[in-house]
Amino acid sequence: STNQKPEHHGCNCFIHPHPWMFPINQILKSMSWTKIMECVPNFSEGRDLQKIDEIVSPFRAKAGVKLLDYSNDEDHNRLVVTVVGEPDALKEAVIEAIGIAVELIDLNHHQGQHPRMGAVDVVPFIPIKGCTMEDAIAVSKEVGQRVASQYNLPVFLYEKSASAPHRENLAVIRKGEFEGMKEKIHQPEWHPDFGPAERHPTAGTVAIGARMPLVAYNINLNAPSLEIAHDIAKKIRFIGGGLRYCKAMGVELKDRGITQVSMNLTDYSKTAIYRAFEMVRFEAKRYGVSIIGSEIVGLVPMEALIDTASYYLGLENFSMQQVLEARIME
């Protein structure tokens, strides 16, 4: 089902420093910000390391902004960046990065496993500390207005920022991708929220919005058949009668001769990582297929990992208060 494609996922990624690799005093210093917002922009470039470096550069060494992670995937030809900061500083860095991507990426020459409609495909803002979902919505709308006027880019507001119910789901907006958007954008129900009702000739369109944190989680299967991965994905996602807060699709990893069930867990407190893992394993059995590994793309809330560890270790009455790093950060 097309409306269940995840926002982002990846494999064979070049993963760059994770937060636990930063000195603890650096993290504590950034946590002194009174308001912290997260942004996870997805760019349609996963192969050209020079372009990737240029796109990421606005997030480096900026006051009020911390680059936590970025991973590029060659199969999917996609870059996922995780950055946090004070809302105003974050906003400026994101707008600058979008401008660089619009300049560098030409989707007429882009091919990859991941669905995409724009050079900058999706830009979600997530409230983390001292700010509300309403604050994140306001930031997303301001960024949308500014990139539309500065870069002549059509902008769709999605998720919590959506201007209409049919625009909440990213995959519904993205259906038809860059190629199909040339005609789709002229339909009255698909006029952009900001910017011209004309697809940008090289950069396409962008979805910008506010949402809660999600976990991008992929499970690799020893199945060369993409059909098997598709079938498993259909069964575990919510629309197919599966897990309530799971979006999933099957992906082929040609260079490794395997397939993958790629998921977004949109509320990890209600659809746990371990539950997704076990359900994929359960469904894979009927095909005589087994799990050969899994991965988390980008960053993951500590709570989500603690929950999974507690399940597999059978921990009784375990809480976040028993996690050393969590206590240090208090």
Regions found by a protein language model. Give the residues of each.
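Short hydrophobic alpha-helical segments enriched in small aliphatic residues
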Residues: 9-10, 17-19
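Long, contiguous binding/interaction regions
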Residues: 32-330
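Extreme N-terminal basic, low-complexity initiation segments
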Residues: 2-9
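Charged/polar low-complexity intrinsically disordered segments
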Residues: 4, 20, 26-29
